Design a protein with these regions (language model features):
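N-terminal Rossmann-like NAD(P)+-binding domain of SDR-like oxidoreductases, especially those catalyzing
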Residues: 2, 6-228, 365
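Short, solvent-exposed loop/helix junctions and linker helices
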Residues: 23, 84, 125-128, 198-199, ...
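Short, flexible micro-motifs
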Residues: 27-33, 133, 154, 160, ...
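C-terminal substrate-binding subdomain of Rossmann-fold SDR/epimerase-dehydratase oxidoreductases
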Residues: 33, 39, 227, 249-373
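Short, solvent-exposed loop/turn segments at secondary-structure boundaries
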Residues: 56-58, 118-119, 232-237, 269, ...
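Activation loop
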Residues: 62-65, 112, 241, 245, ...
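NAD(P)-dependent short-chain dehydrogenase/reductase
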Residues: 159-183, 197, 207-282, 307-313
């Protein structure tokens, strides 16, 4: 529903303060976007109906994060608890702020492979149709506003699994002379491979964002993220890899490893580094841009390696259970290349690597994630 007061943008002299509209504003990247763009002096309108709680259960609720944003930012933040599938409610928000909207950051999504199989209609409606609803409203009400879309490396389906990996002691790895050793680039095909139902809905959204950029000459970017992480993640088994590793370690929960001997590799990028990339695009937008965005060679780990880091930080051994079957479409190895983005935005730099990320997650949750009695 709309906020009761549904305020006009604040005035700054004779002008209105520019507005950043953030979908999924209670989530990891969404909440970081709210803080970041408020810090740049924009008013922020956040859209989030806490559907994550429906996807993953009460422990995944983002309501606590929304309350914290309101407390921290006061009048600079307005929350709208609507569903992106509700076209009428979404249109009212866009019409209300109109051309005062300076940027749209679309992070809202259904992010789980497993959940998508159970309810493919909701998955597609949220990921694909919800994205279309956002794009069309930008076109109608604030066409000059850049659209920053959080896509995923899952748009490449299981194609990365066809690469010639070697099994090492703690990880799968490519040979140093392989073209993708420094990271998979955007030239990898997203066609004719197994994506999972979730991956397919994200492909539809990804391509539609590109199409609105090209067809309507809108400023759009697709960021195909690796593992996006940080201390604000409401981590669960189905989503939130590093956060869930640390949570299981701290709460003495059993962590289930799905296939690949626990040696599957993920690159991990901190939400801070994601948002500095968003800001770079906001300041110098392009039409129909597509970039991989992840930890790259700077920040990556296998599950076994992440376990070892978590154990060193907390002083507690991981409790694990191995499941032979990997998840459908899951990557054996993913390290993405940030080279294309860094070529276009050479001032952007990464700050956080995996040990720093896990340490921060531990310190942020040490009073909350306590062992089960």
């Amino acid at each position: 529903m709309l906020a009761p007061d549904f305020p006009r943008p604040r005035r700054l002299g004779v002008s209105y303060v520019a507005v950043a509209l953030v979908t999924g504003s209670g989530g990891l990247i969404g909440s970081e976007a709210v803080r970041h763009f408020a810090g740049l002096g924009l008013d922020v309108v956040g859209i989030d109906n806490d559907m994550r709680q429906e996807f993953f259960g009460p422990e995944a609720s983002t309501a606590w994060n929304v309350r914290r944003l309101a407390d921290e930012l006061g009048t600079a933040y307005t929350h709208q608890g609507i569903d992106l599938r509700d076209r009428d409610a979404l249109a009212k928000i866009f019409a209300h702020y109109g051309r005062n909207i300076a940027v749209v950051i679309h992070t809202a999504a259904q992010p789980s492979h497993d959940w998508a199989v159970r309810d493919p209609f909701t998955d597609f409606d949220v990921n694909a149709v919800g994205t279309l609803n956002v794009l069309q409203n930008v076109r109608e009400h604030c066409i000059d506003a850049p659209v920053i879309h959080c896509s995923t490396n899952k748009v490449y389906g299981d194609r990365p699994n066809s690469l010639p990996y070697t099994e090492l002691a703690t990880r799968w790895e490519l040979a140093p002379d392989h073209p993708y050793y420094d990271g998979i680039t955007e030239d990898m095909s997203i066609d004719q491979c197994l994506h999972s139902v979730f991956g397919a809905s994200k492909v539809a959204a990804d391509v539609m964002v590109q199409e609105y950029g090209r067809y309507f000459d809108m400023k759009t970017v697709v960021f195909r993220g690796g593992t996006l992480t940080g201390p604000a993640h409401s981590a669960t088994e189905l989503h939130g890899y590093l956060g869930y590793v640390m949570r299981c370690n701290m709460e003495r929960r059993t962590y289930k490893i799905f296939g690949y001997q626990g040696k599957m590799v993920r690159d991990s990028i901190h939400s801070h580094d994601v948002l500095t990339a968003f800001e770079a695009f906001f300041r110098n937008p392009r039409s129909a841009a597509v970039y991989n965005l992840g930890g790259g060679r700077f920040s990556n780990s296998s599950h076994l390696e992440a376990f070892a880091i978590a154990e060193k930080i907390s002083g507690h051994q991981m409790i694990t259970e191995y499941v032979e079957q990997n998840r459908v479409g899951d990557h054996k190895w993913w390290i993405g290349s940030n080279a294309a983005f860094q070529a276009d935005y050479p001032d952007w730099k990464q700050v956080y690597d995996v040990p720093m990320i896990l340490r921060e997650i531990y310190e942020a949750n040490v009073d909350k994630w306590v062992p089960a009695q």
